[in-house]
UniProtKB/Swiss-Prot annotation:
It catalyses: dTTP + H2O = dTMP + diphosphate + H(+); UTP + H2O = UMP + diphosphate + H(+). One of its GO terms (biological process) is nucleotide metabolic process. This is dTTP/UTP pyrophosphatase. It comes from Bacillus mycoides (strain KBAB4) (Bacillus weihenstephanensis). Pfam families: Maf. It is found in: Cytoplasm.
Length: 191
């Protein structure tokens, strides 16, 4: 597999690509993410992933560009990254003792084709105490994560059950992504 461009500065996405031995370089997308009138969370994450990948692909037309976006939903409410500690605590209270959905959308763009897909994973939290929430938010870990938790970090102790792709919750459905990238291998030029 030849080198792709990851249109993201996410350390988690970087780690997952490294884990799968996918050669890549990072070019962070500076696009202003806009959510239009979409019918579903899956449409939202695929659109945002496509916006990110398209913005980077404009200047890298001979490469394969990968964009991704993750959101958490509960009871038809979209939970993105919290804007502050109070919002992080509010999100964690909302998710406490309940099942929510995590959607990760992926867009892969080359000169020849564009592929978008998403994965949906259900995550159930144990009931959380106010002290657990306060200590976790004070760690700062949840402040840059959709839904205010990192399943691969300290937030892992909140997870009672998961149904679906764990790595999608982390930030990339890596097994499916590697399979999808195979159809682009001939489209990738050497860096």
């Amino acid at each position: 597999m030849r080198k792709i461009i990851l249109a993201s500065g996410s350390p988690r996405r970087k780690e997952l690509l490294e884990l799968a031995d996918v050669p890549f370089e990072i070019v962070v997308s500076e696009v202003e993410e806009t959510i239009g009138a979409y019918s579903s969370p899956s449409d939202i994450v695929m659109s945002l992933a496509l916006q990110k990948a398209s913005a980077v692909a404009e200047n890298h037309s001979n490469q394969v560009v990968l964009g991704a976006d993750t959101i958490v939903t509960y009871d038809s409410r979209i939970l993105g990254k919290p804007s502050n500690e109070a919002e992080a605590k509010e999100m964690l209270r909302l998710l406490s003792g309940k099942t929510h959905e995590v959607y990760t959308g992926v867009a892969i763009i080359s000169k020849e084709k564009t592929v978008t897909f998403y994965e949906r994973t259900e995550v159930t939290f144990w009931g959380l105490t106010e002290e657990e929430i306060d200590v976790y938010v004070a760690s700062k870990e949840p402040l840059d994560k959709a839904g205010s938790y990192g399943i691969q970090g300290k937030g892992s102790i909140f997870v009672q059950h998961i149904q679906g792709d764990y790595y999608s919750v982390v930030g990339l459905p890596i097994a499916r992504l590697v399979r999808e990238l195979k159809q682009f291998d001939s489209d990738v030029t050497h860096a």
